[in-house]
C-alpha cells in the first residue's frame, strides 16, 4: 500500500505545490464542523485528526497512549527535527497530491500547544484560527470528561506540567470537571492568542464560532477568499445550509470560579469581541 502510494505521488507531484493550512482552536470549539464544511470543497484535502500520520514522524507526540516514551504535549521550534519533519511533510504532501487537491487542510486541537513547532516545521503554512465562548467550551469538555474519553493517556498530567512550567497561576482551585474544562480552554486560548498576536496578519484568518454559526455563507466565503480558492454561490448555499447550533447559547453562569479561571479573555469570548489582531 505504501509502495503504491509513493509511486502515485512520484507520478503526480511535479504538478503540485505543497500548501498546508492548519485549523487552530481548542477542542470543542467547533473545529470539527468547520473542517467538515471546508472539506466539501473539491480542491481541499482534509486531514481530520490524523494522529496516525503525526505519530509516524513524531511518536513522542502521542500523549493519549500510556506506553509513549517521554510524551510531549507542548512543542516549539527546538522540538522540530529535520529528519522527522521531512517524513511528516512527505506524508502530508502525499495526502494532498493523491487527493488531487491544491490545499492540504489539517485539524488537530492539540496543535494549539504546538504553534511555534508548526511555524518552524511548516514555514509556508497558513492558519484558520477559530475561537469560541469559553463557557460553552468548558461545558462541552465537562461532558466529555464525564464520559471518560477526554483526558486519555498522559494528557491531564502533561497539561498540569505545562501550567507549572510556565508559572501559570489561577485565583481559585480547579476541582470540578467544568473547572478542568475551563482550565484547559484558558491554557489553550492564551497560547494561541500569544502566537497570533505576533504572527504576520497575512498568514491567518480569525473567526469566532458565533460568527460562523450566525453567518456561515459569509464566513466560508471569507475563508475561501483567504485561501484563494474559487467557489460558486450555489456551492456556498448548499454547503452552509445545515450549519446551526446543536446546543443553546451560554452567556452566563452561577459558577463564579469559571470567571476567575477564564479571566478577561473569557469575557471577550462571551460577548464575541475577542480578536487577536
Where are the model-predicted features located?
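Acidic-histidine catalytic/liganding microenvironments
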Residues: 41, 122, 199-201
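Conserved phosphate-donor/acceptor-positioning beta-strand/loop module used by diverse small-molecule
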Residues: 107, 118-144
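Glycine-rich phosphate-binding loop used to anchor ATP phosphates in small-molecule kinases
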Residues: 87-117
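PAPS-dependent sulfotransferase catalytic core
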Residues: 1-91, 98, 242-246
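Short beta-strand segments
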Residues: 23-25, 104-107, 129-131, 206-208
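Short catalytic/ligand-binding loop motif for oxyanion handling, primarily in non-cytosolic enzymes
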Residues: 32-35, 53-56, 112-114, 135-140, ...
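Short, conserved active-site loop motifs that form the nucleotide-linked donor/cofactor pocket
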Residues: 44, 125, 202-204
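PAPS-dependent sulfotransferases, especially Golgi type II membrane carbohydrate sulfotransferases
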Residues: 1-21, 142, 149-151, 155-206, ...
